[in-house]
Amino acid sequence: MIYNFDELIDRKNTSCVKYDALKKYFGYEDLQPLWVADMDFKTPDVIINAMKEKAEAGLFGYPIATEKTYNLVKSWMKKRHNWDIDTSWINFVNGVVPAYSATVEAFSEEGDEIIVQTPVYFPLFKHIKSNNRKLVKNPLIEENGYYRMDLEDLKSKISSKTKIFVLCSPHNPVGRVWDKEELEELAKICIENNILMISDEIHADIVFKKFIPLASISEEIANNTLTLNSPGKTFNTAGLNCAYAICKNENLMNRFKNVVEKRGISSVNVFGFVALEAAYEYSEDWLEELLVYLKNNILFTKNYLEKNNSKIDLIEPESTYLLWLSFKNTISDYNKVKQKLLEESKVALNEGSSFGLEGKGYFRLNCALPKESLEKALCKIVTKF
């Protein structure tokens, strides 16, 4: 490998949520953080150097996305996901979550229903409630460690008040990369019922099988989908607040833009565009090596649990660096599992129940860290369970 993902970097006291907010969120400071979805790997040097060059110029006025910026997003979608988009379909925003919240306002009214597939990344249902919409759950089905959509349940949940379906693709936290057939059937149901699809595809680059952007499947689906994405997860630049929406349907995009402007979320950090351009133009080789390292970490975790006859079950992911671990066969009392992880294993994981009640009994572990640190964490967990 050209890149050193084994490098141990001390992130404490660097004003990062993952390390410096442990006391606030978990009540303890002496925990190994395996929760927030960012990586313990350095951002590629080419991105760091581009930002240094920008910093050394000494000018930090209001930035703008140039023709190059738009074209790099377009070319990235083509070469990574075989998706042909037009630059006119792209609108930059300062984050996927703020943009998602804007879609809720733009395409529904107070009291309308929005469907999500739980367990799922919690802001996806949090912003439904904060916008005074009604959350409707279409829980995923888990069978023998594999999750699938329950489309019959989805059909039964649709009413005249249903306006939006939210797709998490790839899925956080269960790690599914949805197959084309699943997406087609899902889209068919939504289109037949005049339900707009919002597809959160922020983890699209961190995949271990072919990923299909929802809107790439057909023109009909593209005209009924607004996609949200960012280089933040891929290149560990989440703190630079640079994301974008992609939508072929001009009417939908204009409605989205109106709310984006109203909310003041169109201004991207001055370094955000710099990082995006360096990432999408020069950092693909880094990403390829990252994927190999992450896959090895996943396999290491699987083998470690098996070798130690652990009662913890890994839902092996098809995407993301987030491992969905079932503790259902360890201790029946969920609160005792949580307490034991904090007080005895001394690790900070995301509680499964925070992704919806369907996640109870599970915990999410971030494996985007050096193998040495991962092994240390697994040892602390397995010895107590």
Protein language model regions, located:
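Conserved glycine-rich beta-strand-loop-beta hairpin in the small C-terminal domain of fold type I
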Residues: 277, 293-302, 314-327
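Walker B catalytic acidic pair
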Residues: 201
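Helix C-cap/helix->beta junction micro-motif
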Residues: 131, 192-193, 221, 345
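Conserved core of the PLP fold type I
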Residues: 60-188, 205-216, 220
